Amino acid sequence: MTDHSRLENYPLSPLQQGMLFHALSVPSSGVDMEQIIITIRERVDFSAFERAWKRVLERHPVLRSKFVWEGLDEPLQIVEKAVSFTPRYLEYHNLSPSELDERVEDYLKKDRVSDFRMTEAPLMRLAVFRSDQPEVKCVWTFHHILLDGRSFPLVLEEVFNLYDALRAGKDLTLPNARPYRDYIEWLRARDLS
């Protein structure tokens, strides 16, 4: 058994436990896979874009989390100190806007049923569709066990604030983010009272 005591770890919330159970019971269902389509209508500095995503992963432990359960009394989320994250660039040239949209739709269908390995972080991926069109489309896919509907817009806001700063050659200091661990500790304290 792997010793997880040296990495940050904590229990799952009840909702996360349900999602983990579902991911293990019904693989490739796509039920808890979130897909966000991002359209960028300007010339993109892909180096700055990648660095912005990597900075956000560094800032938010939950985005570096994996889940373990085998041989344990209860599942744990383990926060990796660092994770590898590189967008997948898909090149589509000589396509009309509608043909590019068809390629994105095809990708969405296949991507939705491409499971994450819950024991490997990060539980997210980014596909970047480059073409002759004056815009770039991206698909950010993540497992819902990481982020809820109120959290993911905040993550995207940080990505684009960092991207704008990096593209301008500036350093942006963001306010400290509250780690998900605090929520888990609050839940456990509430359950004990």
Regions of interest found by a model, annotated:
Residues 92:
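Helicase-core coupling region on the C-terminal RecA-like lobe
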Residues 3-81, 86, 95-192:
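Acyl-group handoff/entry surfaces in thioester-processing enzymes
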